[in-house]
Design a protein with these regions (language model features):
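Short alpha-helical oligomerization interface
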Residues: 16-20
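The conserved beta1-alpha1 loop
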Residues: 5
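Conserved core of the sugar-phosphate nucleotidyltransferase
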Residues: 61, 116-149
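Short N-terminal binding/cap micro-motifs at the start of the first secondary-structure element
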Residues: 8-12, 146
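Conserved N-terminal catalytic core of the sugar/cofactor nucleotidyltransferase
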Residues: 2, 10, 24, 28-110, ...
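Short secondary-structure boundary/capping segments
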Residues: 13-14, 68, 99, 125-128, ...
Length: 149
């Protein structure tokens, strides 16, 4: 699941008319970076929650997102908070609303963060899925531009 429902307040005025996951970095929308990273690890099913200007995201990505010749297309489904509730539900509410559409084991990642070096690997997912753990938090170092976090 990729979280993509937030208002993007710190990015205003850019997010006044564009949802933050569609802002481009290096010629690609922010949401495309985790989609490509997941596709590179063999994941072909992704649920995206939407909120602020949420209709823009399925309009841009559709239900099948092709990555060119590199990987198979990613099948996309959407949890449309803005459509059903009139607003985004915050992180926990968005996850709770999406649970019926998710598998018993799933990854949750931000869909509006530039992360070109996506740190997860399919082997990590498979190891977690085989474990008795209920959740796993993946900690990553603070980026050089924000060393205090």
């Amino acid at each position: 699941m990729l979280l993509a429902a937030g208002r993007g307040k710190r990015m205003r005025p850019l997010t006044n008319a564009t949802p933050k996951p569609l802002l481009e970095v290096h010629g690609k929308p922010l949401l495309e970076w985790p989609l490509r990273a997941l596709a590179a690890q063999g994941f072909t099913q992704v649920l995206v929650n939407t909120g602020w200007l949420g209709a823009h995201i399925p309009a841009r990505f559709g239900t099948s997102y092709a990555h060119g010749d590199a990987w198979p297309a990613t099948h996309l489904r959407y949890s449309r908070e803005e459509q059903d509730f009139g607003h985004a539900l915050e992180t926990a509410g968005g996850i709770a609303r999406a649970l019926p559409q998710l598998d018993a084991v799933f990854w949750l990642a931000a869909g509006d963060v530039y992360a070109p070096d996506f740190a997860f690997a399919r082997a990590d997912y498979d190891r977690f899925a085989a474990s008795p753990a209920l959740a796993h938090i993946w900690l990553v170092p603070n980026p050089p531009h924000n060393p205090a976090g």
